Amino acid sequence: MTLSFVTRWRDELPETYTALSPTPLNNARLIWHNTELANTLSIPSSLFKNGAGVWGGEALLPGMSPLAQVYSGHQFGVWAGQLGDGRGILLGEQLLADGTTMDWHLKGAGLTPYSRMGDGRAVLRSTIRESLASEAMHYLGIPTTRALSIVTSDSPVYRETAEPGAMLMRVAPSHLRFGHFEHFYYRRESEKVRQLADFAIRHYWSHLADDEDKYRLWFSDVVARTASLIAQWQTVGFAHGVMNTDNMSLLGLTLDYGPFGFLDDYEPGFICNHSDHQGRYSFDNQPAVALWNLQRLAQTLSPFVAVDALNEALDSYQQVLLTHYGERMRQKLGFMTEQKEDNALLNELFSLMARERSDYTRTFRMLSLTEQHSAASPLRDEFIDRAAFDDWFARYRGRLQQDEVSDSERQQLMQSVNPALVLRNWLAQRAIEAAEKGDMTELHRLHEALRNPFSDRDDDYVSRPPDWGKRLEVSCSS
């Protein structure tokens, strides 16, 4: 089957990119590819059998027209000016059978006009982390970019130390970022901001294209998508780590995996990025930061969208987020209905978990095994203050009994939303260290495990992290 590529970005947004081709690595070789995703995209298996090829920037497929996009943004709350694809190249937009498109974005593809002081490269460590994280999030049901392939090489790339240079093929329906809009707004080119909005509506919100109120309705949906995404992050204990406006997806996708982390111990103020000295992007601050970022996006639209309409959309953010978050947390607790005491029970559990530094994922997974007519709980032994847990658990059991559903029905619901497996940093690190020594077994094994996060396991993927695996410091260097 021949793959078809279109050039919508190149043709319709001519001042938003620089056309250029990838710069190959030395002795590049394919070490992993996503068979399931490749099948979904109807990619012939033969493309993965002939060396690095397109996956390593050594070849282009017919119809591809590579380019690097320009955008700007606020980083850690401060205007950073022009940024752009400093090491990534959009190879092409694949046209799928249903008429939608999928960007093929090659990360680590070499220098671009937007590389600034960088070298245009990515390292094996960061490409493995992004591939694992994006696929983990996908199988958790959270909107995200996807990973299609990883190529490693003999080219040294210098970060804190010399590391193997690598490339990641990332795919997504669009790489539109808040920062694209900021770039032209701060250049006082509001007509180009409008062109970006029209492009987005035409291709991703086409049902609004002929509506006279299209900009307000579109921005309201961007707000809702962002609120829903952040709510989902919070329910699984995911910390992004670097929520700059240039890392915010217009489509509400999880984008740009850098120093991310899933909670081990329940620590509301968890900071996964060791460069975040003020905790701006801490776990519990993510909802507020996302709203701040949406406000920056709204500002770029103010020359052609009424400020009252923008503020009305922004005002809906909190309620949308709380609605999504509340619904999912009730499911995690096994509540089939909504009762007035639900929030208090959840907050008391969180307080108990924070005091005891309980493991976030294990606590909710073990709670899924609760039998409402049994005073015993498999979770009890996880707590030192048994009296405090017993007091909470007695009230929790009483709340479960209000719903009048069987244990099996409730447990089935809980186990479908409380994962047994998340991508803890130590699991990723173990796969990385093996891969850097040339052993890809753990990389493939972990990828396979992450496809079934809600299935019980009896291996160390679902155990508490070892001492060395706690509080692993992760930087933005990639």
Curated annotation (Swiss-Prot):
Function: Nucleotidyltransferase involved in the post-translational modification of proteins. It can catalyze the addition of adenosine monophosphate (AMP) or uridine monophosphate (UMP) to a protein, resulting in modifications known as AMPylation and UMPylation. It could be involved in stress resistance and play a crucial role in regulating essential bacterial processes, including flagella synthesis and iron uptake. Can catalyze the transfer of adenosine 5'-monophosphate (AMP) to Ser, Thr and Tyr residues of target proteins. In vitro, prefers ATP over other nucleotides as a cosubstrate. Substrates include SelO itself, SucA, which is AMPylated on 'Thr-405', and GrxA, AMPylated on 'Tyr-13'. AMPylation of the grx family of enzymes may regulate protein S-glutathionylation levels in cells. AMPylation is probably involved in redox homeostasis.
Family according to the record: Belongs to the SELO family.
Catalytic reaction annotation: L-seryl-[protein] + ATP = 3-O-(5'-adenylyl)-L-seryl-[protein] + diphosphate; L-threonyl-[protein] + ATP = 3-O-(5'-adenylyl)-L-threonyl-[protein] + diphosphate; L-tyrosyl-[protein] + ATP = O-(5'-adenylyl)-L-tyrosyl-[protein] + diphosphate; L-histidyl-[protein] + UTP = N(tele)-(5'-uridylyl)-L-histidyl-[protein] + diphosphate
Amino acids binding Mg(2+): 247, 256
Positions of disulphide bridges: 272-476
Cofactor(s) required, per the database record: Mg(2+); Mn(2+)
Active site: 246
Outcome after substituting residue 130 to A: Loss of AMPylation activity
Organism name: Escherichia coli (strain K12)
Enzyme Commission code: 2.7.7.-, 2.7.7.108
Underlying gene: selO
Reported impact of residue 107 to A: Loss of AMPylation activity
Lineage: Bacteria, Pseudomonadati, Pseudomonadota, Gammaproteobacteria, Enterobacterales
InterPro entries with a match to the protein in the record: adnlytase_SelO (IPR054838), SelO (IPR003846)
Top enzyme class: transferase
Positions that bind ATP: 84, 86-87, 107, 119-120, 170, 177, 256
Pfam families in alphabetical order: SelO
Gene Ontology process terms (BP): protein adenylylation
Activity-regulation annotation: Auto-AMPylation inhibits the UMPylation of chaperones. AMPylation activity is activated in reducing conditions. Under non-reducing conditions, the formation of an intramolecular disulfide bond between Cys-272 and Cys-476 reduces the AMPylation activity. Shows a preference for UTP over ATP in the presence of Mn(2+). The UMPylation activity depends on Mn(2+).
Phenotypic consequence of residue 476 to A: Abolishes formation of the disulfide bond
Official protein name in the record: Protein nucleotidyltransferase SelO
